[in-house]
């Protein structure tokens, strides 16, 4: 083959290549949906919604727990202090109980003023305690309840149902819905059996 022939062949090949169309592969966008991608997206959305709902539920539970802890701290934060103050209330009550009714009726002005001062002090102390959620209760006449009272002795008394509180040695106190100090009581025996209480416990009269 001569050099001229070789050049002709090359020229023919080049011309043929130029004449043939160039076909490229189609470009697929990275985010084009693939087979089954709709189901995957639905599952992901459902999982995300489930996680969001669980997170919201946990946040709501945390909020409620926090509110309860704050409320309990406000209500019961004075428990230790209130328990100490009860001794003062007891001493004031003992001082008043030590004065017979006849002596009060015939008391001289000075003694009468002293008694009234002690009574006023006791009322002020009980009011201050009540403002902080501490309430005094007297269960006399109520059916004995071990949740709120402590029986010190039994008293033969057939005139009332057995198990009735007939004497209160020491008043009880509650703080919030808890017993700060149970009442010390005497319970009747010998009478008819007390009827069962219907429902919640009775603390007696709250003062």
Swiss-Prot record:
KW Hydrolase (keyword) present: no
Biased composition, class Basic and acidic residues, residue ranges: 1-11
GO molecular function: adenyl-nucleotide exchange factor activity; protein homodimerization activity; protein-folding chaperone binding; unfolded protein binding
Gene3D superfamilies from the UniProt entry: 3.90.20.20, Head domain of nucleotide exchange factor GrpE
GO cellular component, one term: cytoplasm
Region (Disordered): 1-39
Keyword Chaperone attached: yes
InterPro entries: GrpE, GrpE_coiled_coil, GrpE_head
Domain of life: Bacteria
Keyword tags: Chaperone, Cytoplasm, Stress response
Pfam families in alphabetical order: GrpE (PF01025)
PROSITE patterns xref list: GRPE
Record localization: Cytoplasm
GO biological process: protein folding
PANTHER family documented for this protein: GRPE PROTEIN, GRPE PROTEIN HOMOLOG, MITOCHONDRIAL
Quaternary structure annotation from Swiss-Prot or TrEMBL: Homodimer.
Function: Participates actively in the response to hyperosmotic and heat shock by preventing the aggregation of stress-denatured proteins, in association with DnaK and GrpE. It is the nucleotide exchange factor for DnaK and may function as a thermosensor. Unfolded proteins bind initially to DnaJ; upon interaction with the DnaJ-bound protein, DnaK hydrolyzes its bound ATP, resulting in the formation of a stable complex. GrpE releases ADP from DnaK; ATP binding to DnaK triggers the release of the substrate protein, thus completing the reaction cycle.
Homology family: Belongs to the GrpE family.
Name of the protein this chain belongs to: Protein GrpE
Organism per entry: Rhodopseudomonas palustris (strain TIE-1)
Lineage: Bacteria, Pseudomonadati, Pseudomonadota, Alphaproteobacteria, Hyphomicrobiales
